[in-house]
A protein has these predicted regions:
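Functional surface patches built around histidine and acidic residues
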Residues: 1-136
Length: 136
């Protein structure tokens, strides 16, 4: 686990939980304008993928591309309280998310060298990078 990636995940999960509800086209990779980061509406067509990829370098000393899997929509609460086991089970039940975790499909040439996760109520984020955390 990477302290820097955990920090990114905790920051984003807090933003997802606390932000106002965004446009319905904005998914869980979106960032509100309520923090010290570049906001974006991440849409299903991945047109704003750079917003996600650049967050590690924007928020930390980890000058690397980041990849994220999420549960929950900005500003919405499902009523389900997640823990690590429920979040992992949900991601494993989604072929696209499970592929990220297991480096399959699109991700088979990546080797995750750092990762971190955060959970608040019905929101969860896990971040991955092919670069190691530079912190000792």
């Amino acid at each position: 686990m990477s302290d820097l990636e955990i920090g990114i995940a905790e920051t984003h999960v807090r933003d997802l939980h606390d932000s106002p509800k965004l446009d319905p086209s904005c998914n869980g990779h979106s960032w509100s304008s309520k923090g010290a980061w570049t906001p974006c509406c991440y849409t299903p067509d991945h047109a704003q993928a750079k917003c996600m990829w650049d967050k590690p370098a924007e928020l930390t000393q980890l000058k690397a591309t980041g990849f994220e899997i999420t549960i929950g929509q900005p500003g919405e609460t499902s009523g389900v309280v997640l823990d690590s086991q429920k979040a992992i089970a949900a991601w494993q039940g989604s072929p696209l998310h499970n592929d990220v975790i297991l480096n399959r499909g699109t991700w088979e040439k990546m080797t995750w060298r750092s990762m971190g996760a955060g959970i608040i109520d019905s929101h969860a984020c896990a971040w991955f990078s092919d670069q190691p955390d530079p912190a000792p």
